[in-house]
């Protein structure tokens, strides 16, 4: 893109000022429409050091009510961020509906720096490019406006700006070794930048090259492009998104009705196995921490199937400093106002730690689907988005273990009645549980489709036969141990 880029002609000063005034006014009006329509806008500023990203950003945000936007400067990842997936620190920054988020440098800057300084090779570069493309596409598919600007200046212009900044003691601090290094290796940087821009350019979120030699002209290009992009997004906000074909390897899994639930353990067998398996898991937890391998354990299942007791037998073997259990309920207002995966990105473990989810992102294709909390296009799209999310975790190095806790309808009824008739257990049963029970067949259809479409080789499902809770608990412990041992043996 940069190598074939034709520099636009700068308008005369009078025209420039007129267009600046018009664009600033228009953006001020559009911010209210963004709020009214609930349009989330993510704006990424990338480019050469000293190209003026910060100063243009400062000019642009003067036209927006500060209650409706945030600005984040993405420096080098912190130690904590390095222990999370590559995209973690960007996904958690996405704006809520009706808000704008400006990023002064972002995922492009991180990737190209790693390439330029030989921190990643070709294979890792391609993997990160795929991650970026999936990330950006998921945002735009879910109604986000993503606008990406690259500020372009010549080698000569950059060198001149570096020298001017260095001459003034009050601005000298703004020049780091990065700018000098870029200028010295300008051609190499140009090639890497150009390749990245080409690799991540798409019709849904294209790159806009900003001629940044003149500051006012750069501001005008950004403002007019923002205005045009926002107006288009507001007009097209209700268009359905085409469904993508799944490209991830799937394994066959039986339907729930085909699974026998008569498996059980005696109390004596259960106690013996529980003690041995918990001791084994405790040892493995220490090894996980030393090897810095993250683990994500996801629980789904019927109400009263025994998820809580199952989780308790796993956590009973773990160092409390190295795990966290996340009970997932209906999304809070700030969670509902963002991409549905946002609240799960926020709860990911750091390397060496374990995150256990009691209910998960699969709510999108179960309760949200059946209760009408999302459109058919949205839940149909979610299968692929979830596979992508889990692929991101797998590529990061996470062990992903997914459990469906299965019981039959009669067993559920017996447990519901026991809860209703036992004072200390009454808090466990709600009217919603009874309503969901009435939709058993609909839920079973949805669960079977979920299992079929998301049973990937890197994040397979495990069905726990839980008519006998003791059997299910022991089976879960064995599966967790086997998965962790396999990861440690790699």
Where are each of the predicted segments found?
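Glycine-rich phosphate-binding loop of ATP-dependent small-molecule kinases
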Residues: 1-490
